[in-house]
Amino acid sequence: MLALTSATGKLGSAVLNAILDNKLIDPKELTSSDPSSERFSSLRAQSITLRQANFDDPSSLASAYKGCTSLFLVSTPRIEMDYNNAPLWHGREAHHRAAIDAALQAGVQHIYYTSLGFANPSKAGVMRAHIRTEAYLADLAKEGKCTYTVLREGLYNESWPLYFGYYFGLKEETRKEVIVAGDGNVSWTSIPDMAFGTAKVLAAPREQWAGKTFYLSQKKTHSLSDIARIVSKVRGEEVKLKVVSRKEYEDYYVNEKGMERPSVEWWSSTYDALKDGECEIDDGTLEALLKEAGRAPKPLEETVEEMLR
């Protein structure tokens, strides 16, 4: 049986939907760790086991994973744990380790972990917890305690506003100039496409992907400058991209936009990674999985237009 975590989150819920919509895994072979969500009322009728699990309560994790042979571990969204250069086992990797240790205690043999579409090593602070988790899984595998698969999920099409100067106002935005701390090509990938690829991996015999680390990302790239042009076209007015130093970027969003400094400083390192080409992914795994199903990756332009309409 496969245990799914974070099944109400953006990626986790999309993966669950892909599994069910495409009938990739019998619902009786699934367990999810968030029984309180209203969205699961219909899933109970499909015999999916729902159990309570809390990263801060190891005993609840072990109970949730009992009887499962595999775990799909989606990284925790508690990014504030990573702020201020959190030392080892004090960042988000602490939650990941708690889940992994509980899974092994419960008898889980294989762990699928959702990492992120940056390099390893990486200059991006957002990647630190992922790198630490990947290393922990590798150590456990060397000790013969489990097998694992690392899926480095591409940067979401839907997350472009975060990289594009916190452009969360979307169609309500009035800025004619967007300040960032760097630019580079990114292999943006839609959540539904990644979810489908992930679901296909989860449904395959685990030996097929065991011990592998790979990216689930489309190959076509767009820079933030490209996004500025797309946004300008959709809005019918020019929106310029302005690249400044990390310090200028941090001061601007803290002093002018009222954002929390630890958050902005943590995120600003992402632009060093973009400049180094870390997010320009040359891995055909996802496109091959989509092609087998007669699908093609959703273009970034389409996502941006949908979000701005």
Give short role names for the model-derived ranges.
Residues 2-26, 30-31, 35-40, 56-59, ...:
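Oxidoreductase cofactor-interface core, primarily capturing Rossmann-like NAD(P)-dependent enzymes
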Residues 41-69:
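Conserved Rossmann-fold cofactor-binding substructure of NAD(P)-dependent oxidoreductases
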Residues 51, 70-75, 113:
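Redox-cofactor binding/interface segments in oxidoreductases and associated redox assembly factors
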Residues 62, 100, 191-199, 297-305:
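Short, amphipathic alpha-helical "lid/cap" segments that border enzyme active or binding sites
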Residues 63-64, 102, 136:
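CheY-like receiver
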Residues 95-102:
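Short, conserved SAM-binding segment of the class I
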Residues 209, 247-309:
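A hydrophobic C-terminal alpha-helical subdomain
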